[in-house]
């Protein structure tokens, strides 16, 4: 700090000449007056010095506080201290947070359950191999984030969040050989689901040991074998209690979409499925998310969407694996950003497997037909050889196809890239309809009702489905027959091959090639 206490430089006076003594006297007097004035100025300055020091100290402390405040995290909150974290992580949501089994299923007066039909997805599992590689690569950006905060003094994460991130190491579930394997939480998901169902429907699911057989309980799984076994163990105490039906690679019941050329064709998906998703990703809402996350982590440029995706995958997988702890990577996002990421995935599946494409409603038809056929048999003859429980295990696309066919959780307004703010209360939320261990359960009842003694109750994630035309979720069988009967009895998947697009062209090209070859053979070539 410069101070106004510097002395007046000495005045050079030459006495070599023969100037008069009067001039010398005048100069000496002027010099003395200057010194006197400087002394007075110095005295005045010294008298105000304590006040100046106080003000200067306050300013310096303020600057230090500002620097410290920025380092501590100049954002809304510290995630490590969050008492109410956002738990809805789209298709990677832990079933523990969304199922309705915390309360008992409602009792249907004057009715008894006679059959249960269920389609469930796999429980909490490890990432795919591609996702494992993506999450494991986060160690590099983690080190950059720490460097940004600790060395460069930029970034806005709080110290506790940084400490948690510093201690983070890739989990054992991120080993390549564990790809898509069921985790202990996934095993628990399925066991507890089975036990809750058994507790709510003892007439169906608490049989004598001699009645536990494949004729009374039908099991079938495709790509969810261990989930099925865990459910069976929770139900009957053994993973091998019932011999399941064999499932084939091209299973048109449990995975109809995988046998559909039009659905899988990249060009067809690009034209229908990805347009709204891509528009949302390049739009202002998502790009603002990328910008804010990048600055929060201390980057002066926008990090790539791949990095955003990797951090989001780490956040939601780790939360699903261990429901009682928080993932350090969730601290990267605030609640609104997690809602945006959730909507992005909802948008993707809306067109991939839901109401965004007409073909998806066709692909859920085989499962609807199977359910209706079982109920039809038992409605006409309760003494038929129908099993008491039918339990299928597949993936979220097949479940979403079935929900679409049945019109469950359909919004009046389609989801688009531009409706995020308008669809906060949307029905199509993958967090709630297709989390880990998601399920649709239908229970057929025989009732003492003069009007219709056959009724059906639907449960989605163990919560009653509120169907128009049904009473608090309880549907008359005659109503369901009129609603689904014609559709379920006419499940044609020829749409997968005759619809315009690459698969149809491929078929025509194949016929043309075979015809040309046939002609060449006839001509002797």
Q: Where are each of the predicted segments found?
A:
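Signature for phosphate-centric chemistry
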Residues: 67-501
